[in-house]
Design a protein with these regions (language model features):
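Long, Pro/Ser/Thr-rich low-complexity/intrinsically disordered regulatory tracts in eukaryotic proteins
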Residues: 2-470, 479-480, 487, 491-793
Length: 793
């Protein structure tokens, strides 16, 4: 994905932000300017609202600090101690002992306690001590849990092959620590930090991974080898010490640099180059009515948002191990604001609207009741969306193109935003409405005829109907198909896919639809209709002012985007001969099997090997993002070459395939266990840039180009009870992303069920050496050839 495009050429851009009052934040602000000290105090309504929010945030922090014991239990225990001591005789042992004497002397220095009546002073002191003791006990529990979660040998042990040590670890974890906590992020403080690998081992693994690309380049290999040896002798240990210091001080030694320099510092267009798309279903359609489908989606997404706001969204697990939930903070109300040197992720709280884009018009649609904050019903939303679809409002041809600005290079968009929007009294408020929205809903005017057309709609639209800066856009076609267009810096695809799965699971059961395809009326709708109190919140039209200068700029942005769109070669490949159940029977990892098929297909397509990127999730660690799985290995190359030798027997080729799959699985497990190569090298490179420590080896390592970038997004992350027993009608290709290199491929693959594979392949028409259709055919042939080694036909 985008990380593969940019991770090899990070920039040490620094973003300088001045201090100024932002009245849109509705918070008390104090800053020093040339005019002196400036104090901004918002309306009392917002002060009370902020105080209430701060109070509940404080309660959450105390709750997490006391994990795994609920705050109510700790409070009740402390109050029980207070009553016990209060009703105890003056000569009771709880009042008269050496410990109480020491505590009493210490408490005499507490000026607050001196104001408490003497009768209640000792009980209050004991209650405070009890609360403190429980807090220390829970802190010890979290410390032990964090140490337990640092154990990673289970990653290398398959089912049925667990050692006694791992089984004991699992028993202790499940019995004493893994309570059924429903609070979002409840386990966050217990997660271990992402491990910092050993410097020498990382360099050795990097050199081993590069062997296949230097087989006929002896001189270049010797030069790289010398650079690595010099690095380990000279600047390497110094840079490792810098990283070690950051590892000790930060929640995650990598994540902040990763977000800054891989995403926010990059100056290229987001559309195609960074943003990605998702497809809900390949064939299934719960309703053909656009407004109904959109209303149900919005309703379900707002349900998820409210559960995240209340911290009741259930934590995710990988087996017994909890996953980091930090990315979920950025799913809603998040916008990437362009900057000259570096972008900024902006979040907005207390927002109750989404923005709808239809036929070049923009609407502000309330999804929460402005007074009660209750969620609007699907029926209310459908009525509001119907009014948009049937609106006869005029469309300003220049205004309609404004979203094309978000597809422009970031520095260019930053200048345009400042000139025509931020510093324009008429346009600053409409822009703020869009950027503060919960998300953007795009009601497209066309219906795709194929999965390729649908994928292109979600990836980039027509060049001016996606707000690429938003955390995500929900797209609903004229015939009721839907997908998402998502910005990448705030989080990874698995996070948004999990949120979307909650919404789509409801669609699978058709919970919100009537037989004629409209959304159902909820009981509160029926009551309101019967009493004549039913209300539809009419969407507000968002209007911008335009001039000749803006017209030229936006037309230029759109024309450039259209050229880039036309250059994208996309192919969605459905392979139904067999699925992941077949590799399992061959004692091979399904992911490794598919990766070897893509290696064979790429070799047949290009005639040589190139570096291949596969993303691995690092959410087992606090604030973890991803790590690179380097697919190409000496074992994978040996298998691919063997497949091209007719003289070799099927048994010999199958043996090499299994060895290659085992090697890939070992590499994947190393990455997940925090022993990857690329994030460590990237951190060393950032340290060398920041501290101005020159390193030829790191410069050479960062020049790598990932010609084949691959990614798998899990289709099902929710428990089976959330889906119908038969999942065949709900198959999906999941989504995809643009090619990482102009002369390379981007491949997003989906292992759906036990009997189906999907591949979404992208490349550039302008590159004569690539063809998405050709690679798709090579992948299908490779999968069949590999299966034939086992006697399959």
């Amino acid at each position: 994905m985008a990380e593969a495009r940019f991770a090899v050429r990070p920039t040490a851009a620094l973003h300088h932000v001045g201090f100024e009052v932002d009245t849109s934040r509705k918070q008390t602000q104090l800053y020093v300017s040339r005019r002196g000290l400036v104090l901004y105090v918002p309306h009392p309504y917002f002060i009370i609202k902020n105080m209430r929010r701060s109070f509940w945030h404080g309660v959450d922090k105390v709750q997490f600090a006391l994990y795994p014991i609920p705050l109510s239990v700790v409070t009740a225990f402390s109050f029980g101690v207070f009553l016990w001591v209060l009703n105890s005789p003056a000569d009771a042992w709880i009042r008269v002992n050496c410990v109480s004497d020491i505590l009493w002397r210490l408490d005499e220095r507490n000026f607050i306690s001196s104001r408490i009546p003497s009768r209640y002073r000792m009980p209050a002191l004991c209650a405070n001590v009890a609360f403190g003791a429980v807090t220390l006990f829970t802190a010890l529990q979290r410390f032990v849990l964090r140490k337990l979660l640092s154990y990673n040998r289970w990653i290398y042990e398959g089912q049925g092959k667990l050692t006694r040590k791992t089984m004991l670890w699992g028993f202790i974890l499940k019995t004493f620590f893994m309570h059924n906590l429903k609070r979002t992020g409840a386990y966050g403080s217990c997660l271990p930090s992402q491990p910092l690998p050993d410097l020498k081992i990382t360099v050795q693994r990097f050199m081993k991974s590069m062997v296949p690309f230097y087989e006929e380049k002896t001189a270049e290999w010797e030069h790289l080898k010398k650079l690595s040896e010099d690095f380990l002798r000279n600047e390497g240990p110094q840079l490792q010490r810098y990283l070690w210091l950051k590892y000790l001080l930060a929640d995650n030694y990598m994540t902040d640099w990763w977000i800054k320099y891989v995403y926010l510092a990059q100056r290229e267009s987001l559309c195609i180059n960074s943003n990605w798309f998702g497809v809900a279903f390949a064939k299934y359609l719960p309703t053909p009515l656009q407004a109904s489908r959109a209303a149900a989606l919005v309703y379900n997404l707002i349900k998820v948002k409210k559960s995240l706001d209340r911290r009741t969204f259930p934590p995710q697990f990988s087996g017994l191990v909890p996953l980091d939930m930090n990315q979920y903070r950025y799913v809603f109300n998040t916008t990437r604001i362009p900057g000259r040197e570096m972008d900024v992720l902006a979040q907005h709280e207390g927002i109750k609207h989404i923005v709808v884009i239809h036929k070049g018009r923009f609407y502000q649609l309330e999804v929460l009741h402005p007074l009660t904050n209750h969620q609007l019903t699907p029926y209310q939303l459908e009525m509001a969306l119907e009014s948009i679809l049937h609106s006869e409002d005029e469309t300003d041809p220049v205004e309609a193109l404004i979203p094309a600005f978000t597809t422009a290079p970031r520095a260019e968009w930053a200048d345009i935003r400042d000139k025509h929007f931020v510093n324009n009294a008429y346009n600053v408020k409409p822009l703020r409405v869009i950027e503060e929205a919960i998300f953007v809903l795009c009601l497209d005017e066309m219906e795709p005829k194929s999965l390729e057309e649908e994928s292109m709609m979600y990836l980039c639209g027509n060049g001016h109907n996606r707000w690429c800066d938003k955390s995500f856009n929900v797209i609903v076609t004229e015939g009721g198909h839907c997908g998402v267009h998502a910005e990448h810096s705030w989080g990874d695809a698995l996070t948004l896919a999990n949120v979307a799965e909650y919404s789509h699971a409801s669609d699978e059961f058709k919970e919100l639809y009537t037989e004629d395809g409209h959304v159902k009326k909820l009981p509160e709708d029926e009551v309101a209709l019967a009493e004549g109190k039913f209300k539809v919140f009419v969407p507000n039209r968002i209007r911008f002012t335009t001039d000749a200068v803006m017209k030229r700029a936006v037309q230029g942005a759109q024309e450039r985007c259209i050229r880039e769109i036309k250059d994208v070669d996309i192919r969605v490949c459905r392979f139904a001969d067999y699925g992941k159940g077949f590799p399992k029977k061959q004692r091979c990892s399904p992911d490794a099997w598919v990766q070897m098929a893509m290696q064979l297909a790429y070799f047949r397509d290009q005639g040589h090997f190139d570096q291949t990127y596969e993303a691995a999730s690092m959410r087992m660690y606090r604030k973890g993002r991803t790590e690179t799985i380097r697919t190409v290995s000496e074992e994978s190359c040996a298998f691919v070459r063997a497949m091209e030798q007719p003289s070799l027997s099927a048994e010999a080729k199958l043996k090499l395939l299994r060895v290659a799959c085992e090697r890939h699985q070992k590499t994947s497990r190393d990455a997940i266990a925090g022993c990857g190569i690329d994030r460590h090298l990237f951190g060393l490179y950032c340290a060398s840039t920041g501290f101005e420590v020159a390193s030829e080896f790191l410069q050479a390592a960062m020049q790598s180009k990932w010609k084949l970038s691959t990614s798998q997004v899990l289709t099902r992350q929710l428990p089976a009870k959330f889906h119908p027993p038969n999942d065949e009608p709900f198959e999906t290709p999941n989504g995809g992303f643009g090619p990482v290199q102009d002369d390379g491929y981007g491949v997003c693959y989906c292992l759906y069920g036990e009997n189906l594979f999907y591949f979404t392949i992208t490349s550039k028409h302008s590159c004569n050496s690539t063809s998405s259709t050709r690679l798709a055919e090579h992948i299908k042939k490779a999968l069949r050839d590999m299966a034939a080694l086992t006697g399959w036909n």
